[in-house]
């Protein structure tokens, strides 16, 4: 199976709004519209909030509830909710000496598709991304690197397209 990786950056300005149904006093939703970029036609929706003064939390990705502090290096992917899938991901990260700082899993129904979000201490090597993307149990794998420059957030995405 041929797996290709495309790197691109999304520059965005953030705005804050409180939604009645979010369950949080203050929350922010960022929608990354990827339509037209590399023939992709999708929107990724990430919601978050702040606890206390400065404890940021990602609370939802694409409709899946999560609890995850954002980090500089992250992996987002959908996986089938079945035994052994996450073990295979963790083993491949460990073999590449990539440490997991935080991990959150959200699912809507038992045995259906779930969303995994992982904060890492370093970027994932391309060969590990290729191995993970080649798994039939993993879909929509995206490696994310987030950098902030003078109130502008630069998000570098590496979606595995196959």
What are these regions (language model features)?
Residues 1-149, 162:
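A conserved regulatory-domain signal marking ACT and ACT-like small-molecule sensing domains
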């Amino acid at each position: 199976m041929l797996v290709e990786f495309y790197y691109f950056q999304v520059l965005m300005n953030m705005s804050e709004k409180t939604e009645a149904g979010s369950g949080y006093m203050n929350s922010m939703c960022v929608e990354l519209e990827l339509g037209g970029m590399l023939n992709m036609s999708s929107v990724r929706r990430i919601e978050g909030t702040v606890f206390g003064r400065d404890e940021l939390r990602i609370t939802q990705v694409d409709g899946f509830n999560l609890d995850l502090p954002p980090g500089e290096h992250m992996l987002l992917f959908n996986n089938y909710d079945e035994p052994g899938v996450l073990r295979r991901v963790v083993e491949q990260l460990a073999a590449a000496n990539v440490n997991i700082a935080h991990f959150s899993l959200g699912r809507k129904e038992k045995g259906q598709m779930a969303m995994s979000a992982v904060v890492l201490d370093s970027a994932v090597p391309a060969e590990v991304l290729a191995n993970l993307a080649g798994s039939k149990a993993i879909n929509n794998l995206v490696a994310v690197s987030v950098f902030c420059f003078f109130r502008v957030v630069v998000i570098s995405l590496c979606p595995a397209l196959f």
